[in-house]
Every structure is written in structure tokens, then in C-alpha cells.
Amino acid sequence: MSLIDIQNLTIKNTSEKSLIKGIDLKIYNQQINALIGESGAGKSLIAKALLEYLPFDLTCTYDSYQFDGENVSRLSQYYGHTIGYIYQNYAESFNDHTKLGKQLTAIYRKHYKSCKEEALSKIDKALSWVNLQSKDILNKYSFQLSGGQLERVYIASVLMLKPKLIIADEPVASLDALNGNQVMDLLQHIVLEHGQTLFIITHNLSHVLKYCQYIYVLKEGQIIERGNINHFKYEHLHPYTERLIKYRTQLKRDYYD
């Protein structure tokens, strides 16, 4: 069963050039779904379209869009407590003039009615998931942390809300191998043990082959291959997909990807 089902998704720029070309996409419930492809293929555009985060100079159309079996009219009502978004510009999520403990508490209490002590308990638990301790984080400002630490705080801020769906755009790209693998293990755990759903965009094909159950391959704005993990491990693949998996490249991203 799919949690998100969008049909004939098309994204165009101001010159009417199609950047995403009429794709059908399902994000399967309680699975790790992946979208792979080279830089410039349009992967991040798809994530932003699903979240209604596209830049103003791009237009998005589709024939139908359902979330959890219901037609989507205003997706913003689901943000935070139902849909979490992990994206690369994590530093933008925190300001520099308020301590992180106060910011994280405000985020939690925005979505859940709770006292400060309960919020701090949930924050402490989420920070421990990403190998951080509250005593090292909550009394600091964002600029006092390294990029890797701040990214893990950001991931914790999404996970603490326990959203039904997490859309993650290169969630561990800025982390070292040890912490990156730990975060991926955590994301796999919340899907397998807690029934959450993950849609991940990544260039790390080793992670895709290790963690994901369903995979989409995007090339020049079109989905050229899709299937479960067994299809990608054991069946004949599109030549483009074979090339991606063979080299397992970590490619730089351009503005729209």
C-alpha cells in the first residue's frame, strides 16, 4: 500500500521546458523508498514538489495526488508531526541568537501539547539517537557546533516528532562514514520497528543497496526504472542503472538537484 501516490507529475520552468516529465510515483508505506540518478536529473525537484516547496519560477502540475488514501489539497497541514523533511540546507533551520535547547523545545511544543520537561525528555532521547548528548548541545548556539554536529541536531529535530513519513534529501552527505552509517541504521530501525515510512534521495548507492526496499531511477526528468531491491540485485537492469550501480559515484549536485 502506498502512503503517497502522485500521477503524471510535471515540472516546468518559465521557458516551458519540462524538468520533470510526467512521472508516476508511489511511496510505499512502512518501507525505505529511494530515488537515485545523476546530478541534474531532477531528484530534489521531485521532493520539493511533493512538499510544495518549489521555487516560484517553476510550475508543477499533476493529474492526482493522494496522501494516505486521501486527495491532497493543502499539504502544509501535515508538516512536522505527519511529514518530516530532512534536507541539505540544515543550517537554515536554526537561528544564531537563540540557544538550541530553546529552539528545539519550541519546535516540539508547536506540534505536541506538552510541558517543558516532557519536551526536553523527547529532545534528549532524539539527540541520543544521533549520538549526541543534551549536555553538549542544548546550552549552545548553532554557530558553536561543527557542520556534522548541527546536521545531526537537525535530523534529531525531525525524528523527535515521529512523523509518519520522512522525506530525506541526502540526509548523511555531510557526515563522516561512522555517523552516516549510524544515522542510516537509525532510519532503517524506525521504519522496520516503528512503522514509519522513508523516501530518501541519495548518491550513496551502497546505502541504497543495503537499506532500501523500493527504488526509482531518474534520468533527465524521467523515471527509467523502478522496482524492489531484489529486482536491482538479481534481474537485468537498464544500461543506465547498471552504470550507476557499477561505479556507485558520489556526484556533486547542481542548483536544481
From Swiss-Prot:
Top EC class, one word: translocase
Subcellular location field: Cell membrane
Catalyzed reaction equations: Ni(2+)(out) + ATP + H2O = Ni(2+)(in) + ADP + phosphate + H(+)
Record bears the keyword NADP: no
Record GO terms (molecular function): ABC-type nickel transporter activity; ATP binding; ATP hydrolysis activity
GO cellular component: plasma membrane
Membrane topology of this protein: Peripheral membrane protein
Entry's transmembrane regions: none
InterPro entries: AAA+_ATPase (IPR003593), ABC_Ni/Peptide_Import (IPR050388), ABC_transporter-like_ATP-bd (IPR003439), P-loop_NTPase (IPR027417)
ABC transporter domain residues: 4-245
EC nos: 7.2.2.11
Pfam families according to UniProt: ABC_tran
Alphabetical keyword list: ATP-binding, Cell membrane, Ion transport, Membrane, Nickel, Nickel transport, Nucleotide-binding, Translocase, Transport
SMART domains: AAA
Chief place where the protein resides: membrane
Keyword Membrane: yes
Record family assignment: Belongs to the ABC transporter superfamily.
Binding partners and assembly: The complex is composed of two ATP-binding proteins (NikD and NikE), two transmembrane proteins (NikB and NikC) and a solute-binding protein (NikA).
Name this polypeptide is given: Nickel import system ATP-binding protein NikD
Organism the protein comes from: Staphylococcus aureus (strain MRSA252)
Encoding gene per record: nikD
